[in-house]
Amino acid sequence: MKITDYSPRSGRMIKEDGTVVNIADLLAGEADAVSGATYNIDSFSAQSGRMIREDGSIINIADLIASGQIGGGGGTGGTSNYNDLTNKPTMNNVEIKGTLTGKDVGLVDKNQGAENAGKILAVGFDGELTLVDRNEPLENLIENYYAMRRTGKVYQTKIWKFASNPTPTGEKMLDNTGLVFEPSTDTTEGQDDYLNGQHPLFEWCNVNYIRDADGSPRPTYIEGMEGYKTSGSVDVGAMQMSFYWNWDTSNAEYDLVTISDTPHPELGLKPWPECVRADGTVMPWCIGSKYISGIASDGKLRSQPGLKPERKQSHNNMITNYQAKGEGYWGAGAVRNTFQIIFNIIKGATKSSQALYAGCTSYSFQYEAAVQSEEAHTYFPVTNAQANSIVVGGYVSVGYGYSTGSTISNDRGNDSVHAYADSVKVLSIEDLDENNKAVYLDIPEEGAFNTMPHVYSENLSAPVILTSIHYRSGATDAVRGRHDGSPGSNTDGKRPYRVQGREYAVGGYIVASDTMTWQNEDGTRTVYSAKKGTEHSSVTNTIQSTYKEAGTIPVNSSGSVGDYWIGDVGVDFDTGASYPRAQGSGSSQGVGDYYYAGGTGTNAFREYLQGGNLSVGANAGASCLYSGYTLSGAHWSYLACD
């Protein structure tokens, strides 16, 4: 009901001695009227001042108001000085007067305990307020924060062994049951129950980090802190709380993949390898390099956004390249790749990464200039049909082929292919004429180029070409929120993707710094992987004596050396290396990625190339493995991570 639905009553009330006072005057004093209407007060009868309290006793509020015990006083219809009142309002026994704070009236406990002396309120990773010591080391703050957030929940997915059921789809179990996960893009936010605030294990943030002598990462700044950087002599990582895992293969028909933020020894969980120091100490955080490495302003391989992925990496040159940063730097091992396999199984309930994200695996083209012009432009001319294959936001190079003396090679490993523009973004595609389109590139005006052929000799020239190339780091930063996914599309095969903040599949194989295969005479491959703290080496005898034999890749089911589709993968708990464990059949069954065995050579090491490149299509994926190059093999599509 509205107050205007009620008629006003006379403010006159009868005191105990029979006299009449007007309590409206006593209380209101000179207050403004709430209505323009006026009444003849003599036409209203005076009301009794007696009122019944909750305990049943009776008071006369006319007497109390008139005497000044509540409200105004004096009995004359005026107001009294607040300081003269005998029944002033209080809160927590504190008289309400003057300028008071919540602390003054007891809303904030003055005694917060000696243990909280000097602490301040800060906003945590989840947006909640928490007490922190401004002088406490960042590592301690992170450890305490994560300790308060651990829930003990157990996330498990059952995946079928290929021999019993070829489906790539698994079944979520325990605390994983019923949780919905959908990949996102830069414009579409898929449902992701893992980020609903009830599952802290899956929450991540960006950090700067350094590595100790054994290779273990330590956070130095969190994004949002003064001092956090994305350029210069720093590395950017994705950090989440440390976790425990198991990949139980004991059942004949299925595997159980399990993670939790607490050990759960009854489930046989072990700390994730990235979270364990060489001495066995479990760190409170899990930090992995966020981006594919490029050359930063300090001339060293760094994990930073906006860098051109450094091409032509190999197992051997990575030792030199990363050691330039310090003792504990060797480059990322196979565990960085296994990380995405685990979280794809847990969240996506699938053995096949390409069931969730295709990656930049079907984006290979080289087009000659559709229009030859001596005038320099910042666009490249292509035919209308060719333009349909090019992605705005994708990356290309402009140059010309390399002369072998009698022929032209357009291999991306030739520097000339990148002579005019090297790994630059496509900004837009616009009509040039009725038959052609202009592909505008992210280059300055002084970088404009003409499209006349490059002349090597009177008899040999090379046309100017547009070449698809790896994405620069940070393309997936455009994905909405903290979600997993790709910019633009997760399915068109032309974009990288991220998982738990880490970027993958930018268009090149990733060389594992710590893992390689030994070619056995029977066609099998022994996987060697270095434990944390092990010095990396290119010497066969040293590798065989100091690295761990992490697993065996079976020979093709034909009995002779041959490539095959992967049905199941195996893992090593100490190093985190993953490898083909069983043969499959096609891209839509089992793991659905391809294993390249590397030919019939024997008794030699081969480097571990993971994921695929921009031309292998459905053969690519998180478990794709190429085992065909020597440890010194370097190629334009071989990239690396810190």
Predicted region positions:
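Short aromatic-cysteine micro-motif
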Residues: 231-234, 264-401, 415-423, 427-505
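Short, surface-exposed secondary-structure boundary micro-motifs
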Residues: 126, 401-402, 515
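Extended N-terminal export/anchoring regions of large proteins
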Residues: 114, 135-298, 319, 325-331, ...
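Short catalytic/ligand-binding loop motif for oxyanion handling, primarily in non-cytosolic enzymes
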Residues: 247-249, 296, 338-341, 511, ...
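C-terminal, surface-exposed recognition/capping segments
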Residues: 142-165, 426, 509-517, 540-642
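Surface-exposed intrinsically disordered loops and tails
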Residues: 222, 353-377, 404-418, 452-493, ...
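Fibrous stalk/shaft segments of extracellular and virion attachment machinery
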Residues: 2-136
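Hydrophobic beta-strand signal
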Residues: 122, 397, 510-511
